[in-house]
Amino acid sequence: MSDAGDQSPVLAVRITLLMTASLAVMAGAIVSPSLPALEQHFSHIPRIDYLSRFIITVPSLFMAILAPFAGYVIDTFGRRKLLIGGILLYAAAGVGGAMFDSITAILISRAFLGISTAAIMTTVGTLVGDYFSGAPRNRFMGYRNASNNFGGVIYLVLGGFVATLDWRAPFFIYLVALAILPMVLKFIAEPPRDVSPGGNAGGGRVIPIPWLEIGWVYFAAFIFGVTFYMIPTQVPFYLGELGFADPALSGVGVAASTLSTAITALFYGRIRRHVGIETMLIFGFGLSAIGFFAMGLANALPLLFLGLLLFGAGQGSTTANFSIRLLELAPYHVRGRIMGGQASAVMMGFFISPLLSQSIAKTSSLSVAFFTGALLLLTVSMMFGLRRIVRRPEART
């Protein structure tokens, strides 16, 4: 990464990775406050109530499909070139949503946004494994999660306010990627192919890949994706049902959950000194379930916002564990593919989320959709609890 004695480049690399990682967070949710206005603009389109949600989730589908391929490219050809290309495509595809008056064309541009985000998300996760190990990796993952969500707060609130001007306005925020690109060009170097400070190059040995353990992580990441994306896709409409249709308030509501995640994530590295990954997952999924249950009960703003804050705090205790555990399990030569699999699991959850939640909302209500999400989260928490009982003592890594 840089000379260990030169702290400035090290800090610059960390800041660059944090800023680049935040692009994945804003890929879908940045335009969520403008969804009701977009739906009204295209009200003549059949089933626009579903199609409007796809504005957010089509990127997730293409991320889910292409993230493993991005991981293969990373393992085969390296990290840096794919990251640079992903950022350029991200800016072009993101702003493209503002240039069309066709829902089909907008969805196509969102597909390319998903392709670019798959490259960015997988590459950044792999680079973290290349550059960090042990406690420093835990701390950086916590900071990355916090940075992503603090950035998400800024992007979401900004998106909510500019959406009051025009539903197209939030799409221009994607151009922030072009401001990050010079930092990537200057500070991100290609890691050596045969040496990984945070990994295991194998030394010529064939290292077994623990696919069962990796599968558990992928499953938890998928459920995380399903429930997480109910916030940007359904909260604006839930607020409307409660009589608060202002897109700015929608942005603040989604940002409240994101801010709660960010604050919790700041303490992740400190908490992990004393608590194992499975305990963090049990607590995080359980707290998120309580948050969703409160949201399902909400008939006024205070309880809804309490639920958003609790859910966000649970996510702040959960998200970093996926990447950290996979980086511990993945040999260096397949690290990109393993991290691509995680991105794929999360993004497939994002894509499934509106299909599941909107179907439930149509047949019953949004309240029932959030109760269903709470049940999914509680199930995962209990599954990790049972695994901990069976596998005592918990391994702390």
Enumerate the language-model features and the residues they cover.
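Helix-breaking motifs and short loop linkers at transmembrane-helix boundaries and internal kinks
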Residues: 78, 99-104, 133, 297-299
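Helix-loop-helix hairpin linking two adjacent transmembrane segments in secondary transporters
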Residues: 143-189
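Extracellular/periplasmic helix-loop-helix junction of adjacent transmembrane segments
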Residues: 35-64
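Cytoplasmic helix-loop-helix junction between adjacent transmembrane helices
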Residues: 109-148
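Helix-to-loop junctions at the C-terminal end of transmembrane segments
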Residues: 66-78, 264-276, 361
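Central cavity-lining transmembrane alpha-helices of secondary-active solute carriers
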Residues: 54-70, 255-267
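Extracytoplasmic gate region of multi-pass secondary transporters
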Residues: 213-255
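Conserved MFS/SLC helix-loop-helix module at the cytosolic interface between two early adjacent transmembrane helices
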Residues: 65-101
